[in-house]
Amino acid sequence: MIAIVKRLAGFPKAGTDWDKPPWEEIRPERVGNYMGEKPDHFPRTEVKIAYAEKAVHVLFRVEDRYVRAVSAKHQDPVCRDSCVEFFFTPGPDLSQGYFNLEMNCGGTLLFHFHRNGREGGIEIPGRDCDKLVKTHSLPRIIDPEIAEPVTWTVGYAIPTALLSRYCPVSAPRPKALWRANFYKCADGTSHPHWLTWAPVDDSKPNFHLPQSFGLLAFE
């Protein structure tokens, strides 16, 4: 899987306007594969990614049901809520480690760096998490679960200088390559599912498989 990452001059702070400038210029990627058994509830999940001079910008859009958000502070287990995730190595070399950036529909964040696989994760400190410009269209807490159809967006701008504190970074510019995958999950809801952008060949849901990452090609 390859996603083309366009540069947009003067890109604003993260926003939820999926079909308005500048996001309207970005082609969405579909998070349309799944792990484990095919879920009964298969929310349509798309993601857009772009870059500007000092940050990479990501925006997810989910046509969902059975939505909840109970994790309230950074590094809580947001994967148990209605959640989207961006796992990435900021370069082509997987041996440099990878980040997992997870956000529930209410905008609560889990952000770790993994040098040596899943068990060797490092929590990104709160002062660094706060440097991400975050946005979300739903309230921070959703409890009880919303069973009716609802479309939600979350997004963030990731400063590339922040990433370089943890590993080498291939600066976003034409011909730069990163490795990545995008995910959608909802482990603790009434209709759990584990969706992926790039296919992951594993019998059980497990997003921590960087060897299955696709490519982000900057232009």
Question: Model-predicted segments: where are they?
Answer:
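Structural preference for beta-rich elements and adjacent junctions enriched in aromatics
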Residues: 1-219
